């Protein structure tokens, strides 16, 4: 099993790469960390052209079985459309794993018919308990370990960071939910912002195709005055307004407990 690591958003820390290479070797997996992961160009892991070229290179490599996004941050939206165009044949034989800002690429590649999943990334090894998250991702990529999956999955599902999903809605990369369950998570946002993002997401016509919504972990930042509505009440409110069932909590989030959510198969 050969897994390529690229950084479509922000740079990967070298110590994180080294630790994950060791964990991968112990699991019998060859980790191929692209040099682009360590480039720095302002906020990004290299210019757009370099990040796109690295991703397209590993997508086209028939010797690579899976593509693992190094980390989140910001920037994958700038290359997502181009990444999913004119796909090489080898790209369709791979699985693509990531979350957070990587959700832009998950959406684009899924719409193009590729196998994608929400799940832990390489830089997560630096979190408290992060080695467990990395082992979970490696076990799923290498052998499809079902223990790594979000335990409440009972049918087709998709998972996104809420800010990323809100940015996707109304664009050519908006997910086609087509009866899938939607899992969302968020980090470091005030409740009023979460309320606003859910307003935008649930107001889009495509949201009506969601079978049900579950809420992952959301690290809420304090506002200058109390919002006055609890997190789950916010989610229930916008689900009720849109006629979509709210189905409770989900085991995903920006943390080491983050579980894997494979997106449903799709023909481009």
Give the predicted meaning of each segment.
Residues 1-27, 129-160:
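A short, flexible N-terminal coil/short beta segment enriched in small residues
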Residues 1-63:
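ATP/NTP phosphate-donor binding region
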Residues 33-35, 98, 210-217:
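Short internal beta-strands
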Residues 44-155:
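Active-site histidine-anchored catalytic micro-motif
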Residues 47-53, 196-201, 227-234:
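Charged helix-capping and loop-helix junction motifs
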Residues 133-202:
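ATP/pyrophosphate-binding catalytic subdomain of soluble kinases
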Residues 212-268:
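ATP/nucleoside-binding phosphotransfer catalytic cores, i.e., glycine-rich phosphate-binding loops
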